[in-house]
Amino acid sequence: MMENFKHTTVLLDEAVNGLNIRPDGIYIDGTFGRGGHSRLILSQLGEEGRLLAIDRDPQAIAVAQTINDPRFSIIHGPFSALADYVAERELTGKIDGILLDLGVSSPQLDDAERGFSFMRDGPLDMRMDPTRGQSAAEWLQTAEEADIAWVLKTFGEERFAKRIARAIVERNREQPMTRTKELAEVVAAATPVKDKFKHPATRTFQAVRIWVNSELEEIEQALKSSLSVLAPGGRLSIISFHSLEDRIVKRFMREQSRGPQIPAGLPMTEAQLKKLGGRELRALGKLMPGEKEVAENPRARSSVLRIAERTNA
């Protein structure tokens, strides 16, 4: 039985407004979650509008299946495959907007059985889709010490990555860890300098979660796919929650807004320039939550919304 964990959608109005909804448009909510963005999009669509929602979490799919609306459809899978979902429906180049709310959701964090949080003891799982791939416990029990250290450093920006990785491997050698509390305790004991404002396991849990779910690769693939999926004038509205996510989104929008970089003085014909094409996107800026939203929902504090528009190139 699925418990009803509350989820407060971050930057709800701003993200949907960023899509510049047309009543007859076709939109994608790539991270359905508990449906906050999807329901607001549906409220702004007319009878001819369509919304395609995606999520790889079975609990999110169960919530989505309660929406009885002919304009709405839900797909169980990763948003990195959005180009395939769109092609199957013969909608390539016809999508008017894509919304992505990246990272882990509040219901996932709050449900101890999902294993995402060091604040609640539960199975050491961390998979967005518990039916596929390796759990965090399975990966940590089989990975080399150097690989664990690399993941902690790369995806958690953990300064004590090597020390923590060694402690994890030694603990698993004695008795394999299967619980979130066990991992949190091992990390805390291996951390020589404590941050009074942050739990010592914060960065480790983030890094392992990102690795287990291939989160950054998912984002990069979805962004790349968006260029073929969006119609001219179609919008990208993307919320990120930490610097690694935002860096990828920011870099992508910046690069696609510049167009091809041609060395100064390189002789090229008009035909060659035309073949290279122009810029693919027009960056429309970023937004961050206001003081009121952060006060009501502290998890919104680190969120950043970036919006871009598909050009006619």
From Swiss-Prot:
Gene Ontology BP terms: rRNA base methylation
Binding site for S-adenosyl-L-methionine: 35-37, 55, 79, 101, 108
Example GO molecular function: rRNA (cytosine-N4-)-methyltransferase activity
GO cellular component terms, semicolon-separated: cytoplasm
Keyword annotations of the record: Cytoplasm, Methyltransferase, rRNA processing, S-adenosyl-L-methionine, Transferase
The keyword rRNA processing is assigned to this record: yes
Keyword Methyltransferase on entry: yes
Enzyme class of the recorded protein, top EC level: transferase
EC number(s) from the headed UniProt entry: 2.1.1.199
InterPro entries the record matches: RsmH, SAM-dep_MeTrfase_MraW_recog, SAM-dependent_MTases_sf
HAMAP family: 16SrRNA_methyltr_H (MF_01007)
PANTHER family listed in its UniProt record: 12S RRNA N4-METHYLCYTIDINE METHYLTRANSFERASE (PTHR11265:SF0), S-ADENOSYL-METHYLTRANSFERASE MRAW (PTHR11265)
NCBIfam families: 16S rRNA (cytosine(1402)-N(4))-methyltransferase RsmH
Name of the protein in its database record: Ribosomal RNA small subunit methyltransferase H
Species per Swiss-Prot/TrEMBL record: Salmonella paratyphi B (strain ATCC BAA-1250 / SPB7)
